[in-house]
Amino acid sequence: MTEAMKITLSHEPADARWGEKALYSFTQDGIALHLTGKDDLGLIQRAGRKIDGQGLKHVELAGDGWDVEKSWAFWMGYRGPKGKRTVTWAPLDDAQQKELNNRLKVIDWVRDVINAPAEEMGPEHLAQRAVDLLADVGGERVSYRITKGEDLREQNYMGLHTVGRGSERPPVLLALDFNPTGDANAPVFACLVGKGITFDSGGYSIKQTAFMDSMKSDMGGAALVTGSLAFAITRGLNKRVKLILCCADNMISGNAFRLGDIIRYRNGKTVEVMNTDAEGRLVLADGLIDASAQKPALIIDAATLTGAAKTALGNDYHALFSFDDALANRLLQSAQAENEAFWRLPLAEFHRNQLPSNFAELNNTAGGAYPAGASTAAGFLSHFVENYQQGWLHIDCSATYRKAAVEQWAAGATGIGVRTLANLLTAE
């Protein structure tokens, strides 16, 4: 192995020969990153991306000033989806080293499963990967049940079964229980529900190539809530939390669902399918019904649900929706504490009524007269949350994945949101 390139931190500007406002410069000993005191974490992340772009695959964080946040910022920019990189980390105290190690374990897991090709990450694969991670961090405190294929139909998980039946790979529901006390009667503090569409062709409302080429990442919500629970456990979570992953491929076949089909859910709601590419809300509905039945204090669902959220926020923020102002504010406080970006978008009672159908109680997509697609999608989901006005958060995961590299990020998954949700779970 070649000798590691040393990366140091400097609070002095770079020599003029490196250019005005240079992020970094080469020194006799390696590379110096020039901090300005303004968004130093962002600067370090951008420098990490540039250093990786120069083909330097073995580096050492050296000298003074490195703490867990600066080390992590460097890694977020330096890490890419292909090729191996090694970092010799600067010395940290025991608490910071533990935090860094857990971020590397869990958030890298999230990025890896989202980046994996759909051929390798089908519904069953995703569910099993989630089980493996949580069993690793939670040990005997974790139990789970997997329901798949026709068993879903027999148990009336009609949204998940309907969406997934068109694929040769059967749909899967993972119900996982983290119960630190071991008491079967212990109250459930929170339920986390994740959309796990492992490939989304759009179904018969088929996507164009430009919108389909990143759809291996349509299980980003499932990865996010799985990682959030795992990371919360590493931070000492001592409350009972249930994880529900709704995993399926959305494919075209002779057995795939069609426009005009009507889905009858266990809570009595009927939904007319008028767009098979609005499938995420159909599978999440089953998970939210199960979550509501647990009577938890907190329900969080996460999904790469709408293009409308990306149009509003780009890939820089996750979109947050809630009727519970106090809870939404606590989530935003957790995001600020963890240096992650969330932005609240509107969700009002009238959004719940913008899904008209001539043949069912709800349409799975709003009509042309109601263009607020991210808000109406959240409104749809609210019909499957028993007490939707309190204790429910919906995350539209617009920051989960980037199709192209930018100055701070390589192409692919980001891992944004894991720390925020873990913070909320452990702080509540």
From Swiss-Prot:
It catalyses: Release of an N-terminal amino acid, Xaa, from a peptide or arylamide. Xaa is preferably Glu or Asp but may be other amino acids, including Leu, Met, His, Cys and Gln. CDD domains: Peptidase_M17. Its cofactor is Mn(2+). Mn(2+) 2 binds at residues 195, 200, 218, 279. Keywords: Aminopeptidase, Cytoplasm, Hydrolase, Manganese, Metal-binding, Protease. It comes from the Bacteria. Homohexamer. This is Peptidase B.
